[in-house]
Amino acid sequence: MKHQVVFERQELFDVNMIIAMTFDVKGEVSSGALQEAFAEAVKCNEILNTKVVIEPDGSAFYVSSDEPESRLIITEEDLDEVRMREERIRFRIEEGEYIRAFVNLEEGGMKLLLLMHHMGGDGKSLLYFAEDLLRSLGGETLQFKEIRTAEPKGKLDPISRAIIRSYNRKWNGHVFTFPDMDEAYRAYWKDRKTTVEVEVLEEEETAKIREECRKAGAKFTAYLIARLIKDTKGKQDVGLAADYRHDGNRSMGNQASGTSVVYQYDTSKSIYMNAAAIQKKLDKKLKSEDSMSYILNFMGTLKPTLVDAVNLEHAGAYSDKTSAGLAKLLGFTGKTKDLSITNLTVADIPVVYGSFKLERIEFTGPVVSYGKNVVGVITCNGKTVITRHRRTDC
């Protein structure tokens, strides 16, 4: 199997690409049964049985690997501290390492932390992997799922195409390799760290907010945007990740896209009326194929090694006039987007798996090169958990 890395190229050399999910699970489990279930979940997802190779011309591919390197570790460490430590340690995707799992075994259950490099998939991919693991743990036989990556359908506007042609023409064509990625991690993380703030909206409060949103003609994501920018001044440009699975498949692979909404909070109106105004803007973007596929098409049309260079510019591990200019244009350096949101909505996986029950999920998105604060949202058992992942300097 050989699958080219195209529209997910921007994730390849990014130094902050780890998606995190924590699952609270009720039900007695042994370490042996858990390791077996993890191995089965890895085995049934094609992408986790690949590794990433970079060819001499700079093109990159997922290729089959007989020895997947994703692993599960039983630990007594605090899982929040584990996440902070592990995001700074590069995943060896060239060896097939996409997922690191850490588990606290507790009386009557477990706390499971899944960390996945974005090259292994998007947020929903990690959610579906957890489903596979829990199904296997509950005694079910898993079905094999082929790798699936984004297939954008929209078109770029003439101005964007002209910008891309200009940068592609000026680019020197330098090819980067995994040792360059090692250097990027060293350069980036030597004086940086991230923090995560967690807020839980209980079932009653979540239901109340959703009902008020319904009355106002807004959805929960629009409400969250209004809530987050309520105390800011001027127009705010908020990034929004979105699922790009046209056929609703449950395969692992990066099938996410993104858009943004610009809005100035109106203090003369209620938060729900502001949410309704934001919703109108969002609907216009979400209904436009060109808008929804814009970032995928833009990054996928640039020369692949130029995309790598932009990420290395952000990390402080490479500098070139062409890549520096593009990095600034895209917000990888200089003025980056202050706020981005990924709402996985109500987790579309079962809650009960044989004798095991999923109690709570916490989702933390990566603070990618083009963002400072990333908000992750997911609802399970009626409770909504909101995380705010911030990049700070040490």
Named regions from a protein language model:
Residues 1-9, 19, 120, 124, ...:
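Non-catalytic, low-complexity flexible loops and terminal extensions
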Residues 46-84, 102-104, 141-182, 235-263:
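Small-residue-rich loop/turn and linker elements
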Residues 35-124, 128-131, 135-138:
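Acyl-thioester-dependent condensation/acyltransferase catalytic cores
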Residues 36-37, 131, 211, 226, ...:
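Generic recognition of well-ordered alpha-helical segments
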Residues 1-58, 79-99, 233-394:
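Acyl-thioester-dependent acyl-group transfer interface
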Residues 14-33, 95-113, 185-247, 383-384:
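Gly/Ser/Thr-rich phosphate-binding loops and adjoining beta-strand/alpha-helix segments
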